[in-house]
Amino acid sequence: MTEVKSKETRAPSSARDGAVLLQAPPSRGEAEGIDVALDGLLYPRSSDEEEEEEENEEEEEEEEPQQREEEEEEEEEDRDCPSYRPGGGSLSKDCLDSVLDTFLAPAAHAAPWSLFGPEVPEVPVAPMSRGPEQKAVDAGPGAPGPSQPRPGAPLWPGADSLNVAVKARPGPEDASENRAPGLPGAEERGFPERDAGPGEGGLAPAAAASPAAVEPGAGQDYLHVPILPLNSAFLASRTRQLLDVEAAYDGSAFGPRSSPSVPAADLAEYGYPPPDGKEGPFAYGEFQSALKIKEEGVGLPAAPPPFLGAKAAPADFAQPPRAGQEPSLECVLYKAEPPLLPGAYGPPAAPDSLPSTSAAPPGLYSPLGLNGHHQALGFPAAVLKEGLPQLCPPYLGYVRPDTETSQSSQYSFESLPQKICLICGDEASGCHYGVLTCGSCKVFFKRAMEGQHNYLCAGRNDCIVDKIRRKNCPACRLRKCCQAGMVLGGRKFKKLNKMKVVRTLDVALQQPAVLQDETQSLTQRLSFSPNQEIPFVPPMISVLRGIEPEVVYAGYDNTKPETPSSLLTSLNHLCERQLLCVVKWSKLLPGFRNLHIDDQITLIQYSWMSLMVFAMGWRSYKHVSGQMLYFAPDLILNEQRMKESSFYSLCLSMWQLPQEFVRLQVSQEEFLCMKALLLLNTIPLEGLRSQSQFDEMRTSYIRELVKAIGLRQKGVVANSQRFYQLTKLMDSMHDLVKQLHLFCLNTFLQSRALSVEFPEMMSEVIAAQLPKILAGMVKPLLFHKK
């Protein structure tokens, strides 16, 4: 009765509903340390441990039973010791406290070292050796709760205080089910049960404990390591397991509870990150309320821990309150050898060690050296980055994922992204001609552009180009090279190529694999220059620049006296060579091969004159500033030679074109888009067979012209005016080309009388199409109405 009264006089703590403060006996001479390992959380190492690791595992297993027997004998001697004062509580209460003392007392200390900043402050704390008088004083209205210790209380030698928040039991039936038959209940152990109150059935907040005072010895430091906040159900259940198991091992008549152990993978679900994303109470070394554990020893467990009556899940418990103070968990650790997880990775854990909250074995993680100390971090990557964003951010990238599938992914955390050829998907060897490609596609593009190859697709211009089938259709392969933005002169921009390689690696880090249909979007990203030394060029314009034909020579002999017939004959041969270049250029033009083959032939026959005159005007503008007509490098007509020719009026009409280029200062990008639109500038009256594809293609090149205008002009008004001027220039080409067609047809009809030669191809085109064009059987596409 005396013992019951002394317990009733103690007021229950108001720090947490359903929480019971576990106190130690009044006095202890010495306490033995038992291995407590946080498997998968922290594995600090010291110099003593490195020496002990060299011992054989068999010797450690033989020493374990002897140490356990010695611990039990010393605990029995402590109960019979004269220094033991039974007035501090009942016998069962003292047994319970002795169990806690045994788990919490270290036997020695390892070499000191610190990891995460400042040492743990030395704050006096209420010892576990307080008597009932002190407990009664604490129960007063003005006395601090268990979370606020008395600074003047004497310290219990060789141990720290432990405040554990235990889940309140919902009722007698649940309490009887959760403990083994014959085991004493909460009242029999020496402390009363508390009502759950409004929070019955919920979780008691974890570890609202007082800051534990640490009294280091001479030259002794403490490892102050913040770890994940744990669910209160985990702490409460683990506390009950520790109490019951130790009571069974202390020689009681009741055997240990036979409960299936919970896999370590399930325990990781009990940790939860801070609710509001703010910095936790353990950031920057601040000292907050925490659970502190000191342990020392090296040993391999031999039996699985009996933990929880049944396999628990987070859904079985209510979520802890998030509005109040965030629960925290700190640990002061010394030598602790991580026991292997049960299963395929090694022997099961012992009942003396805390279960791990990591789902991966420590062997999967590479050791980290922080501040000169060798340590292995075993936190799961997902939980660590969500729960502890403020914990050493520079080192979070070294934490491996806790699953095998993530480690076997295409791009592991220690490997560089693979460079993929944008043409065939093979491994790229570098940035060739402005695009990241392999060596095979590099050589193919160079030979195709420098040679006189005329590739034709045997299918529908949609052949698959990959590593295996890239040699099947060179036409589709070359078209894909041009669409990707390969330019034969791109190798001159070495600085741009280096920038493209860097950006390609950045794109590969964000997207592990580049799909074939994403080539254009990726090319657009690669074409951007951050330093603005090389202006941004849209990918389509880059393709147009790459397929632009080279300059063709007329083969005119300037040493001979010039006659009207010889000049016209030279111009006809030059037109035939340029017509071949137009055919080759049109095949490489993006979208043109998607049209019907008859439509392709018709468009070339209707527009060849426009394309050749427009290109001649551009050469005159670029090479001679519009002062002469630059037909070819070996055939340039100045004003005097124009007057001496038989077509001086036509020369004056053609001369206006380069002068307009000079007045408008047309850029190369604008010229390339306008030239592509001139190919699509005239159609038959009845329309084309693939009219819808034609309209879509023409619309796309009009958009490209707008983009080209936007490269130089700033503002909507300026862009609109520029677009109006350029489209008016293209509309004026119809009148100029009509005059040239009429002169060409008349010369062709009178070729024998004028002694003018016409090549075979030119003769066929003129005889078949010029009469239809001059008869008005075609439809010119105008941007503006006359």
From Swiss-Prot:
SMART domains: HOLI, ZnF_C4. Keywords: Cytoplasm, DNA-binding, Isopeptide bond, Lipid-binding, Metal-binding, Nucleus, Phosphoprotein, Receptor, Steroid-binding, Transcription, Transcription regulation, Ubl conjugation, Zinc, Zinc-finger. Gene3D superfamilies: Erythroid Transcription Factor GATA-1, subunit A, Retinoid X Receptor. It is found in: Nucleus; Cytoplasm. The modification Phosphoserine is found at residues 210, 259, 529. Oviduct and bursa of Fabricius. Residues 1-420 are annotated as: Modulating, Pro-Rich. There is a cross-link at residue 294 (Glycyl lysine isopeptide (Lys-Gly) (interchain with G-Cter in ubiquitin)). There is a cross-link at residues 7, 294, 385 (Glycyl lysine isopeptide (Lys-Gly) (interchain with G-Cter in SUMO)). One of its GO terms (molecular function) is transcription coactivator binding. Residues 1-10, 186-197 have a biased composition (Basic and acidic residues). Phosphorylation of Ser-529 is sharply increased upon progesterone treatment, whereas phosphorylation of Ser-210 and Ser-259 is modestly induced by progesterone. Ubiquitinated. Ubiquitination is increased by progesterone and represses sumoylation at the same site. Residues 48-79 have a biased composition (Acidic residues). Residues 1-95, 110-212, 252-279 are annotated as: Disordered. Residues 421-486 bind DNA. It holds the Pfam family Prog_receptor. Residues 532-766 form the NR LBD domain. A zinc finger (NR C4-type) spans 421-441, 457-481. Transmembrane segments: none annotated. Residues 203-212 have a biased composition (Low complexity). Residues 143-154 have a biased composition (Pro residues). Composed of three domains: a modulating N-terminal domain, a DNA-binding domain and a C-terminal ligand-binding domain. The steroid hormones and their receptors are involved in the regulation of eukaryotic gene expression and affect cellular proliferation and differentiation in target tissues. Belongs to the nuclear hormone receptor family. NR3 subfamily. PANTHER family: KNIRPS-RELATED PROTEIN-RELATED (PTHR48092). This is Progesterone receptor. It comes from Gallus gallus.
